[in-house]
C-alpha cells in the first residue's frame, strides 16, 4: 500500500477516530470509575491516555493539512509518543506489584523502562528536530526511520513485562486454586488469554513498523495502544478480586 493511494487517507482517518473514541472511553474510566485517583497506576494510566490523544491528533492534523508548522507538529507528536509508550510501560510495571513481590525483579524492570526511555527517545528526538531545522536535512531525514525502528524494537520491554505478569499470575493462582477451585481457574484462563492478546498487539506494532507506510502505521499505533489500555483495565480487576 502506498501512502499516496486514495485509500490511505481514509484508513488513516478511520484508525485515528477509533483511537480518539477510545480516549473518550478511557477518560470516563479515569474520572468516573477509578475509586482511587492517585498512585503510580492511576497517573500512568492518565498520562498514557492523553499521550494517545496527542500522538493521534498530531498526525491527523498534519496529514490533513490542519497543522502546517513542522516544529509544532513534531513537538506535539513527540510529547504524545513519549507519554503514550513510557506511561503504558509504567502501567504494566505498577500492576506487577499485585502478584510479584521480588524487589530485585521489580527494580530491574523499572531500570529497563528508564534506560530505554533515554536510549530510545533522546537520539530519535534530536534526529527528528534536526530533520526539520537543519540547513541540510537530508542525512537526518534518512536516519530518522532507522532510529525510530530501533526505538520501537526497544519496547519489546512490554512483551517482557506481560510475560512476567502471566508467569507470576499463574503461580499465584496455583496457590489459590485449592481454595477457590473453578473460580480461580476461570480467572486464570481469562488473564492468560487477555495478556496473550496484549502480546499479540505488541508484536503487531513491531510488524507494522517494518512493513507499512509511515503515516498509516503511526495512526495504527495510537489505536493499538488505546485498545491495550482498555484491555488493561479488565486485567487489573481479576487479581484484585482474587486477593480480596
Predicted feature residues:
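Interhelical loop segments of eukaryotic multi-pass membrane proteins
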Residues: 36-44, 134-139, 178
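Intracellular signaling interfaces of 7-transmembrane GPCRs
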Residues: 37-38, 100-106, 165-188, 236-244
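Extracellular loop 3-seventh transmembrane helix
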Residues: 9-19, 71-85, 124, 144-161, ...
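Helix-to-loop junction signature of class
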Residues: 52-66, 119-135, 163-173, 197-216
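Alpha-helical transmembrane segments of polytopic integral membrane proteins
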Residues: 24-27, 89-93, 162-166, 232, ...
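Membrane-proximal first intracellular loop
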Residues: 1-117
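A cytosolic-side transmembrane-helix exit/cap motif
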Residues: 92-98, 128-133, 234-244
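Membrane-proximal helix-loop-helix units in multi-pass membrane proteins
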Residues: 96, 100, 105-167
